[in-house]
Every structure is written in structure tokens, then in C-alpha cells.
From Swiss-Prot:
Binds to the SNARE core complex containing SNAP25, synaptobrevin and syntaxin-1. The modification Cysteine methyl ester is found at C141. It comes from Hirudo medicinalis. Positively regulates a late step in synaptic vesicle exocytosis. This is Complexin-1. Residues 103-112 have a biased composition (Polar residues). Residues 18-27, 36-86 have a biased composition (Basic and acidic residues). GO terms for molecular function: syntaxin binding. Its main location: membrane. Belongs to the complexin/synaphin family. GO terms for biological process: regulation of neurotransmitter secretion; synaptic vesicle exocytosis.
Length: 144
């Protein structure tokens, strides 16, 4: 218990270690030019190594494409104006003449009537059609 109280009276025993650590941080900011040059050269070597490896892989890929007659996929180039755009892309004049939205054409060809009146008439006829079908089925069935 005396040592605990004495530590408080004498000061923080870790203060010396903290000062040394702060001194090391200041020394890291001013790096030796030789060390900086060595790091830069090592980074260049590493980048060159990976560049060579990628070139070798591309040669191998091209050999496989040639052997199996595979065409290299080319990504379509997009308009630079569309890069930050939130909405859909503008239609070209050819697309506008062809007939508009592909989603609308698929919805129209799905079997729904083109106008609302035909659809409502079919819905109104539906209960009668169901009743005739059910009554026809019950006539054919004999319950014993």
C-alpha cells in the first residue's frame, strides 16, 4: 500500500516511456533519404514484376484464344455524358422510330386487351363463366 501511495507522490512511472515514444514519432517524419530511395526502388521493382507477370498471363490467354478460336470480349464504350446520369439513356433517332419502350411492347403482347373497356367487360363476364363451368362439372358428378 505504501508503494501505491508513493507512486502517486513521485509521479507517473510511465511518463518516461511516453516521452521516448513521442521522440520516436518525431524521428519517423524525417526519414533518411537513402531509406526513402530504397523504398521507392523496391516499389518500382514490385510494380515491374507484376507488370511482367500480367504480360505473360495475357500472352497465355491469347494463345488459348487462338487455339480454341475464341474472340476477345470487348466492352462497349459508353458515352461520357452518361457517366453521372441518374435516369435512363436517351433514345437514338432509330430507336425512337422503331417504336419506343421495349417494356411497353412486351406488356401489350402478353394477352391483355389494348383498351380498358374490353378488360372491364371480360372481368364482368368472368363470374358467369365460372358459374356455368362449375354447374357443368357438378352435373357430370354423381354423389352417392
Amino acid at each position: 500500500m505504501v508503494s501505491f501511495l508513493g507512486g502517486g507522490l513521485l509521479g507517473n512511472p510511465l511518463s518516461g516511456a511516453l516521452e521516448e515514444k513521442e521522440d520516436k514519432k518525431e524521428g519517423d517524419e524525417e526519414e533518411d533519404p537513402e531509406i526513402a530511395e530504397a523504398k521507392r526502388e523496391a516499389e518500382e521493382k514490385r510494380n515491374e514484376k507484376y507488370r511482367k507477370m500480367e504480360e505473360e498471363r495475357e500472352v497465355m490467354r491469347q494463345g488459348i484464344r487462338d487455339k480454341y478460336h475464341i474472340q476477345k470480349k470487348e466492352l462497349p464504350k459508353e458515352d461520357p455524358g452518361l457517366e453521372g446520369r441518374l435516369g435512363r439513356k436517351k433514345k437514338s433517332p432509330d430507336e425512337a422510330v422503331e417504336g419506343g419502350d421495349p417494356l411497353q411492347s412486351s406488356a401489350q403482347s402478353s394477352g391483355f386487351p389494348k383498351n380498358l373497356d374490353d378488360l372491364t367487360a371480360k372481368v364482368k363476364e368472368l363470374p358467369g363463366t365460372v358459374m356455368t363451368t362449375v354447374s357443368g362439372a357438378t352435373d357430370k358428378c354423381n354423389l352417392q
